[in-house]
Amino acid sequence: MTNIGTKFLLAQRFTFDPNSNSLADQQSGNEVVRLGSNESRILLMLAERPNEVLTRNELHEFVWREQGFEVDDSSLTQAISTLRKMLKDSTKSPEFVKTVPKRGYQLICTVERLSPLSSDSSSIEVEEPASDNNDASANEVETIVEPSLATTSDAIVEPEAPVVPEKAPVASAVNPWIPRVILFLALLLPICVLLFTNPAESQFRQIGEYQNVPVMTPVNHPQINNWLPSIEQCIERYVKHHAEDSLPVEVIATGGQNNQLILNYIHDSNHSYENVTLRIFAGQNDPTDICK
């Protein structure tokens, strides 16, 4: 991906540093916001490929699978929602992250790569005089060649083209506007679908609450009641090792069908950098070691 030390300037406003997972807002006195690891990796991939639609599968592969995790679609939806809050972006009129229905996501703002090295600019300035010399030599070549071409063209006598009698136009029996209207409607229909169709957001239901932290799961997700004791132990262990003001606002549980469960700890916007994804396995007598 990007070189170490490289930063990105988004829409001439946010300075994104993927190495420290930070986002500085120039309109707020360079106020620095810490991103979670998931949100930072999503923004890095979008910034590397601006204006390109990234599929949900590509984002899953880079953010989770390369780290050894397998999560469902709700984890990506939640991470995109948190990232938009950090960018102060709107879902209805986005200026940064745009949802492309049935395809994925797209970074639509301007992106400028800020390299830590300034030698590139000096090398460009040195090369400019050479390009001026090349232009001058090219003009000289054109000046020499053009007269010879003109002389050659004068010497060649083109044969006269035979005169073809014009045919009277045949009156069309079909109204010429009908094909144009059909073509216009065919072009207009997909545009209307893209503009007026909003992707459905994931819906969640609560399956429990431990240490004042609600546990959520997607509405259509299979039952995972047999995992509740392990979830309770994990949350109690997590709360014990974290300060009260940085506790998660909710935990999203997914999986459970392959003897493993994924827990997404979601924090508020002030502590979003602590968002983390954990995986626990069935058959563990004491799962608390990985739930710190």
Swiss-Prot record:
One of its GO terms (biological process) is regulation of DNA-templated transcription. Residues 198-292 are periplasmic. Residues 119-140 are annotated as: Disordered. Keywords: Activator, Cell membrane, DNA-binding, Membrane, Transcription, Transcription regulation, Transmembrane, Transmembrane helix, Two-component regulatory system. CDD domains: trans_reg_C (cd00383). One of its GO terms (cellular component) is plasma membrane. Residues 6-109 bind DNA. It comes from the Bacteria. Coiled coil: none annotated. It holds the Pfam family Trans_reg_C. GO terms for molecular function: DNA binding. It is a single-pass membrane protein. Residues 1-180 are cytoplasmic. This is Cholera toxin homolog transcriptional activator. It comes from Vibrio parahaemolyticus serotype O3:K6 (strain RIMD 2210633). The lineage of its organism: Bacteria, Pseudomonadati, Pseudomonadota, Gammaproteobacteria, Vibrionales. The gene is toxR.
